[in-house]
Amino acid sequence: MNIPIELEVTVPGSPPKKACSISTWSDPVQAPLINTLRKQIVDVKCANGIQGYCNWGLVEIDIIIRITETSVKADIDNHVGGIFDAIQARPANKPNYNENVFEPTTHPDITVLLSDDMLVYDLHAIRTLAEKESYTVKISGEYNASL
């Protein structure tokens, strides 16, 4: 049975950032940003009784990145890649860095929202100026408990 999942989180600060084809999980500097996003997701899932993660069908993701005039600039696709990496489990071949940054519910080996970003079929990402840095991730997909 497929269970629909819809979730939206808004996170203060800058999103995790991927550099070229290197996984966000390979950069220890990104660990606190990854953990912040993962914690927000886990909190929203718990508050709304959402179990599981998107692992079936087609997934839609909307991302809004709010930057200030003094924000450190990065290509929008680097942030999208960083967010995608962060909502999946860390690949098995990535090192265990900064394990103490993560809580048991946000541990890198846990899939918090997306089993594989190849399920994403529709992506909308925008960057806009704001008074404070933050970003919003909205995801719609399905969880198949039998997988």
What positions do the PLM features span?
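Acidic, proline/glycine-enriched N-terminal capping motif
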Residues: M1-L147
